[in-house]
Amino acid sequence: MSATFNFCAGPAMLPKPVMDKAQSELLDWNSMGTSVMEISHRSKEFIALTNQAEADLRQLMDIPANYHVLFMHGGGRGQFSAIANNFLGDKGRALYLVDGSWSSAAVEEAKKLVGEENIDTINIVENNNGINSVVLPSLSNIDKDYRYLHYCPNETVDGIEIFDTINSPWPVIADMSSNILSRKIDVNQFALIYAGAQKNIGPSGLSIVIVRNDMLSLPSLPQSSIMDYKLAVKHGSMYNTPPTFAWYLAAEVFAWLKVSGGVDSVELINIEKAMRLYQCIDELDFYKSGVAVENRSRMNVTFQLVNAELDNQFLEEAKQAGLVALKGHRSVGGMRASIYNAMPIEGVIELVKFMQTFAKKHS
């Protein structure tokens, strides 16, 4: 069977060594005679797994001791509401920077919970002649007492990534669902980082929250206990039964990242993958990108065929070549190649070859 490269935006492909290991021990994990899916989340064996997972993530991201690491339910959308509920009690206000679909969705969820009057927004994307670019605003002259500033550094739908530091007088919260562990960051610059697991961490159903301890003293709203950060901290992310298999796979992904050289090494590979793909798009008149060079995502490469009538044929021939899930999000159309950490560079090389051949064939 020839290799298939899965460019799905999420749930995304997992590293093959992780999948192979999970397959080999699915029915007998840790020599227990049972699957990891079948054991108690409070057993000493599973607790050891969770402790190692947190230790590995702390090492990979250099997470300081004054930050808690939580493994929670709900994915990114669950955290949209959890953030507002945990931090915006007593009529708290927040500022949201909007650079695409997911930051917009976070805004709408927060407004539902605390009202439009308590959520301010700034659109930070400008479109010039069909090219989107990010323009970060000066925040020093805004005289408002926000509990936090929220933004999404990588917008999967739009293919936009923010690499610059957000200089904010308020605590910064970042939705890193799609670029966590893809490049080195300074965790100290953030009050909270959250990520749905299904892109760079593991399967869907799990979310990671990295929250600075002082944030837990902010007034909160009444909410579901399973999304209460204070309760999650108090109970070691086990106030209720967690998604154990997703946690297990996340632990294996963290271990794989360490063996692969850590975030520094993975970042270099991610730069190379994105460079090859964008170079192909730019060099051929057959394709076009709608994102400014400085804001092109390394994780989600969006592009269009100049002749959109060939879109379906492109997708069908790509599928026949073992290159799947390249269709752009339904809200924007075009193509999208999601090249998260698990995508080997060989997959990008094969995609570039296909794009070159397809362009030559139909030019």
Swiss-Prot record:
It is found in: Cytoplasm. One of its GO terms (biological process) is L-serine biosynthetic process. Pathway: Amino-acid biosynthesis; L-serine biosynthesis; L-serine from 3-phospho-D-glycerate: step 2/3; Cofactor biosynthesis; pyridoxine 5'-phosphate biosynthesis; pyridoxine 5'-phosphate from D-erythrose 4-phosphate: step 3/5. It catalyses: O-phospho-L-serine + 2-oxoglutarate = 3-phosphooxypyruvate + L-glutamate; 4-(phosphooxy)-L-threonine + 2-oxoglutarate = (R)-3-hydroxy-2-oxo-4-phosphooxybutanoate + L-glutamate. One of its GO terms (cellular component) is cytoplasm. Binds 1 pyridoxal phosphate per subunit. This is Phosphoserine aminotransferase. Transmembrane segments: none annotated.
